[in-house]
Amino acid sequence: MLSKGTAGSDGSTAYAQGGVCAALAPTDSPQKHAHDTLLAGSHVNDPVVVDVVCQEGPELVLELAEFGAQFTRMSAYDDNASDEQFHLCTEGGHSQPRVVHAQDATGAEISRALLERVKSHPNITLHDRHAAVALVTSPDRSAVAGIDCLAFDDDEHSTTTLGKPVRFAAPCVCLATGGCGQIYPITTNPAGSTGDGVALATALGAVTDGMEFVQFHPTALAAPPPPGEKPTGRAFLVSEAVRGAGAKLVDANGDAVCRGGMGDLAPRDQVARDIYAAITRQMSDSPAAPQHVFLDAQAVEASGPKGKGGFALKFPTIDAELRRRGIDVSRGDLIPVAPACHYQCGGVCTDLDGRVLGTTSLRVTNMGRTRKSKQRRSRSRSAGRRASGEERAPERVLVHAHGPSSHHRHAQPIAGLFAAGECSSTGLHGANRLASNSLLEGLVFGKRAADAAKLHLKMVRAEGVDVGELALDAPWPFGFDVEACPGEVDVAKAVEESAMQVTAELQALMMSHCGIVRTTRGLLRAAEGVQELGIRLSEIRASGGAVASRVLALVECEFLHAYAREVVNAALHRRENRGLHYNVDHCGDQTEGLEVARSEVVS
């Protein structure tokens, strides 16, 4: 198991506050959960995937609790309640309370429980501070045979440190690299969220979809850090559960921000646009107006014992961070918030077994021996075979396009390559992710991908394929040179500085022209800018020679660039407003254009 940083703490999961969805309440059902998911996703989700996730989710959440995840129980708020009953929250877009949580630090608790299991497993080895840079394929490019990384020795590796090239031979690789929040200047994602998985997979010809659907969380904290601390670029998230508990969004005049039917609990895309509109109005009225709105959490505060202390009781992590920044809800302070890039609903396409899909020479094979499918199967049939436990060889599949009406009929699984979580596009989220469905998707597809990988591994072993030998014959990417070069530190520093400048320009470009509200003219400018920055990156790599390939800042910038290109192209091809994609030049009621923009093969 490889981690670019430190396993369990550096990924986005550890920062997830709200919770994980599971239809466990007596009044709830997987069907109701599926309905809410489809509604939030503007009905361009894959309904088969939605049903599978909502059906399988509750059992996996209960399994997490058996693993030792300490979820908050009803007894935490009611002395007469059972210790066995989960406390279920309501968040935006949900018609029922179904969010299982660990106070307001659910992701950290899930990471802790799973990491303990991983560390205690005799057959799992953790490799921290290993940044993936390229997938390894067999010489005939018929299957994945491993992964190339940059390894860093220091505990908190700096981008100025030259990485050591390391190759891991493996018949199966599962990408779980998270999203790409760093393509924007303000994000709730950690620094390592640079789109690695999408860039790695598309380099092999994987197809993407839904890339235009970038979710901006409506309520990132818009307060400066405490005195003496420098801004990090990662915005602190004020969980949606705060609004679910009764907090209200108000503008600088104290007027309600959200005026639609669902009010403050509308899906995130609508709330983010409502806040964007409120900030725009404030700025037009007065240039000195704040570039944020406020959360009034006094109703939450009053929900505590004796009518006070409710906010700190329910949201201790958020309360502690607010107090660090001089904001005290208990004394009536409002919480300044503004949208920040939070989640990518698109990614590399996968089937129901988490297999990455592509249209390249990486075919459905037995490590070099092509097995042609004798019949095309649907996803529902795949689910049926999974339920029966029948083992089968990989076959050609139909690929979802976030809607049952449009399939990419030429895509096939890339042998040995799997993906789960935010880097993938499973069809669950559609045009907008329902709150707290992200951890759930990771659970369901993480397990499904693992089960499929085990079958693939059995097939490889049955054929007697030596994956190590295949990986040994593959060339190193980017002209790696493991030998020390004269002046390499100075070269690396120059490459790093140039790459960081390109990253900053890319972030500004994306925020200006491909953010919450878009225009066709702006998207065209973004496309031109991305192309220009690509030329700059090629020049930087050429100037650094072999040393450049070992500079993490450059590799990450190239990943960011590849991801941004996918987002902009997808946004330009969508000629309607739907979910998270809102172009003011395409005003309408979202009745046309169900087809999702797909990537071209990147080689």
Report each predicted region and the residues it spans.
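Conserved N-terminal glycine-rich FAD pyrophosphate-binding loop of Rossmann-like flavoproteins
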Residues: 5-38, 42, 219, 229
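An anion/pyrophosphate-binding glycine-rich loop and adjacent beta-alpha core
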Residues: 200, 206-342, 398-399, 452-458
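Conserved redox-cofactor binding core of oxidoreductases
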Residues: 65-156, 160-164, 176, 221-224
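Helix-loop-beta segment of a Rossmann-like dinucleotide-binding subdomain
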Residues: 43-47, 84-112, 181-185, 294-301, ...
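Core beta-strand elements of the Rossmann-like FAD/NAD(P) dinucleotide-binding domain
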Residues: 160-172, 412-416
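Glycine-rich loop(s) and the adjacent beta-strand/alpha-helix scaffold that form part
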Residues: 172-229, 236, 435-448, 452
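Glycine- and aromatic-enriched mobile tails/lids
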Residues: 6-8, 15-21, 63, 69-97, ...
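Short beta-strand to alpha-helix junction loop
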Residues: 48-55, 97-116, 127, 187-195, ...
